[in-house]
Design a protein with these regions (language model features):
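Mixed-charge (acidic/basic) macromolecular-recognition segments
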Residues: 147-192
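Short, surface-exposed secondary-structure junctions/capping segments
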Residues: 137-160, 485-503
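Structured, hydrophobic secondary-structure cores that serve as assembly/anchoring elements
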Residues: 1-85, 100-106, 112-119, 167, ...
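Extended, Lys/Arg-rich, non-catalytic nucleic-acid recognition/anchoring regions
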Residues: 74-154
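Intrinsic disorder/low-complexity signal
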Residues: 24, 122-125, 135, 146, ...
Length: 520
């Protein structure tokens, strides 16, 4: 179960999903706490509140990398850091060890990233032996450094190889050339930077290849600028397509019930793939040495992570409370009467003390109050539905490795039925009798043997919380697409047809070849 954070960081690779398992990991990759980085504080709160692993995507607005210049006789070879920003401290060493004395085109290169200028604390090192300035060689310096995580060649490669780096005042080839302080951390990020590009896999779309994504949080753009509704809408749609939950910070101006109720009447985000908690939190800012008020998204992600996986959270007799750990306070208290009003609008209330069971409210999604079904309104049920479909989609990817599609239909059906049966045995889909709790179809009624490109369709239906209602999905594995397609469907029991609902709300009817294909 992974939680993703997208935002500004002090340093680190841009638009790459990096897994961190502790705040120490975050410090190593992204530089730790930084006042302009609301993401750094959100990560600190995440791990303080019980989070165990997170995916971090660093984005920037106009950041520029530092450069490193190697003398090549009268010319210069310029390298630039892969990661932009002022806190990338690099140094390089060049030598000719084990290179033929008659070969004047080859050299060895060592690149190091150090903790600080002049420091001997090496955080990362790369060694490249037998590089050459010959553009036709497989060891051409510009080509080889394309695979470097630290630097790349900037501009043209000179006609002469780099000079050996010498220790100052000596002829000993053990010296280093340090990077210039010409980097730039860039300007504050905008909604445009967060959204990014699906084509370039930047911003939110850098997470496109991340598997097992459970939660996504976009911290405020700056200490005073909140995430815009355009970003929230794109993020909510991204989460719907990836079957994840978006954690939304409450607006900073929500200081009372009336303010909240008025704002909710005009908010444009209503999604069963989004969740919001109130109020904001107060915690120690270790850089400023005083208490500050922060968005609660990082803390919420941590407490949801420690509350257990989707199955245990949905099937437990008592849903875990949204209880903050010690060291963090609420920005203001919410009285018991107002908690019900917040809940009616799909906003959950954080707690610092436990409540008796009869006073606990089930956690809601932001679809609550928008005529959503119970499974879309309540977080535990929504997470269970998303978990079920995700598990089936991932667990059946092997079907494309079978040469004969038809020979995979039976094993796929049995595998999915076994999985759903185990969930039913654990207490899921309990609104109907066992024999009516789920349906799996993967045969010639919805598949064509020998189809090119190869494709396997799996129809899955399982009972919702309300008796007589079902969740129905068509999962399509195809060699023509890198990822499986998962489409919600409506099973028409009278006509035995499948109505496939797309994001743009148009409907396409897929007629089954047998009228009794779906006989419920």
């Amino acid at each position: 179960m992974l939680t993703a954070f997208v935002g500004r960081c002090l340093r680190g690779p841009l638009n790459q999903p990096i897994l961190v398992r502790s705040f120490a990991d975050f410090q190593r990759y992204f530089g730790g706490l930084w006042q302009p980085s609301t993401l750094s504080y959100a990560l600190e709160h995440f791990f303080e509140q019980g989070g165990q692993q997170a995916i971090v995507v660093r984005i920037a607005n106009g950041a520029r990398p530092v450069s490193l210049t190697l003398n090549c006789g009268r010319e210069r070879l310029i390298l630039e850091a892969r990661a932009p920003g002022t806190r990338e401290f690099l140094r390089a060493a060049v030598d000719y060890d084990q290179i033929d004395a008659l070969d004047t085109r080859r050299f060895n290169l060592v690149i190091q990233r150090v903790r600080a200028p002049g420091s001997e604390w090496i955080e990362e090192q790369e060694t490249f032996r037998g590089l050459t300035i010959d553009a036709d060689s497989a060891r051409f310096v510009a080509t080889v450094l394309e695979d470097s995580a630290l630097v790349r060649v900037h501009g043209e490669v000179p006609a002469a190889r780099p000079d050996r780096t010498l220790m100052p005042g000596t002829n000993l080839p053990v010296g280093y050339v340090s990077s210039s302080p010409d980097g730039d951390d860039g300007r504050p990020i905008s909604d445009y930077d967060v959204i990014g590009s699906a084509v370039r896999r930047s911003g939110l779309f850098a997470l496109a290849e991340v598997d097992e994504l459970a939660f996504l949080h976009v911290p405020p753009l700056t200490r005073t600028a909140e995430v815009g509704i355009s970003t929230l809408l794109v993020a909510a749609r991204f989460c719907r397509e990836r079957r994840a939950m978006l954690i939304v910070d409450p607006p900073a101006n929500w200081m009372g019930t009336k303010d909240m109720a008025r704002a909710l009447k005009h908010i444009e985000l209503r999604s069963d793939n989004a969740v919001m908690f109130h109020p904001r939190v107060t915690a120690m800012d270790r850089l400023r040495g005083r208490l500050e008020t922060f968005g609660n998204g990082g803390a919420v992600a941590g407490l949801l992570s420690r509350s257990g996986d989707a199955v245990s959270a949905a099937l437990t007799s008592q849903e875990p409370e949204p209880l903050l750990r010690a060291g963090m306070k609420l920005s203001h208290e919410i009285d018991d009467a107002d908690r019900w009003l917040f809940a009616a609008h799909g906003v959950n209330v954080l707690q610092t003390v436990r409540r008796v069971p009869r006073e606990r409210l089930p956690l809601r999604t932001l679809a609550c109050g928008a005529s959503a079904s119970p499974d879309g309104s309540y977080l535990a049920q929504r997470r269970l539905a998303l978990f079920t479909i995700n598990a089936i989609e991932r667990g059946t990817r092997w079907c494309l490795s079978v040469q004969d599609d038809a020979s995979a239909w039976g094993p796929v059906t049995r595998q999915v039925r076994t999985f759903l049966g185990e969930l039913r045995g654990a207490g899921a889909f309990a609104s109907v009798p066992f024999d009516q709790s789920f349906l799996v179809i993967c045969d010639d009624r919805i598949n064509v043997a020998g189809r090119t490109p190869r494709e396997v369709n799996i129809l899955v239906q399982f009972a919702a919380t309300r008796p007589g209602e079902y969740h129905s999905f068509m999962i399509t594995h195809s060699v023509a697409h890198r990822a499986a397609r998962v489409r919600p469907v409506l099973v028409n029991r009278l006509e035995a047809s499948l109505i496939v609902t797309h994001q743009l709300e148009h409907e396409v009817t897929i007629r089954l070849r047998r009228m009794d294909a779906v006989n419920l």
